[in-house]
């Protein structure tokens, strides 16, 4: 089991909290709650996500996911977080900083999902606001990017409420639910962040 244990210090141990939420890296002990929330939210999430692998919600699939997460964190490529309500430990959703680029770029791409029972209640806006100081602070990023399907109004609102600027449209940018879809591109610079 040590294979899936993430370091207790350094970037892998990031666990920002605030406004009643805790964000931390996924652990094997999260499997049951994660699989239940994803399964119960499948119809809600499907229009906005890539096609799920056939074994995505299995324990073995979750183990592979954790292994990949550990490798990505160690290589400074990606930082996944599960979002919990702090008062009762309820899992709300997840946020991942992916495609981390260093050197002269110092940027990464944010993606997120929220379980259907917690959608449209401000949880993801709050979670992103809690995470941004960590991304600009501890991870020392200059720029955070995001992309969303133009019809995903709730996601657009999350980004705009968190200070992201709409920067353009990327045609047929990502394969979502089996279809290459246009995406609005958003960015947030460190100097524009009011954390």
Give the role of each language-model region.
Residues 1-33, 37-47, 80-195:
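Acyl-donor (CoA/ACP) binding surface of acyl/acetyltransferases
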Residues 71-76, 164:
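Short loop/turn motifs at secondary-structure junctions and domain boundaries
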Residues 68-72, 134:
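A generic secondary-structure signal
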Residues 46-67:
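Conserved GNAT-fold acetyl-CoA-binding loop/helix
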């Amino acid at each position: 089991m040590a294979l899936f244990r993430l370091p207790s210090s350094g970037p892998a141990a990031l666990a920002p909290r605030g406004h009643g939420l805790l964000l931390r890296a996924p652990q094997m002990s999260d499997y049951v709650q994660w699989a239940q929330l994803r399964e119960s939210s499948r119809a809600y999430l499907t229009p906005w996500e890539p096609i799920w692998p056939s074994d995505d919600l299995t324990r073995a699939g979750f183990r592979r996911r954790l292994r990949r997460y550990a490798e990505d964190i160690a290589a400074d490529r990606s930082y996944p977080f599960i979002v919990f309500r702090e008062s009762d430990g309820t899992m709300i959703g997840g946020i991942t900083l992916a495609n981390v680029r260093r050197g002269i770029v110092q940027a990464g791409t944010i993606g997120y999902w929220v379980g259907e029972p917690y959608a449209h209640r401000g949880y993801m806006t709050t979670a992103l606001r809690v995470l941004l100081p960590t991304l600009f602070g501890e991870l020392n990023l200059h720029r955070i990017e995001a992309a969303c399907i133009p019809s995903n109004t709730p996601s657009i609102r999350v980004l705009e409420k968190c200070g992201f600027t709409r920067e353009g449209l990327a045609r047929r940018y990502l394969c979502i639910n089996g279809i290459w879809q246009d995406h609005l591109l958003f960015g947030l610079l460190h100097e524009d962040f009011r954390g």
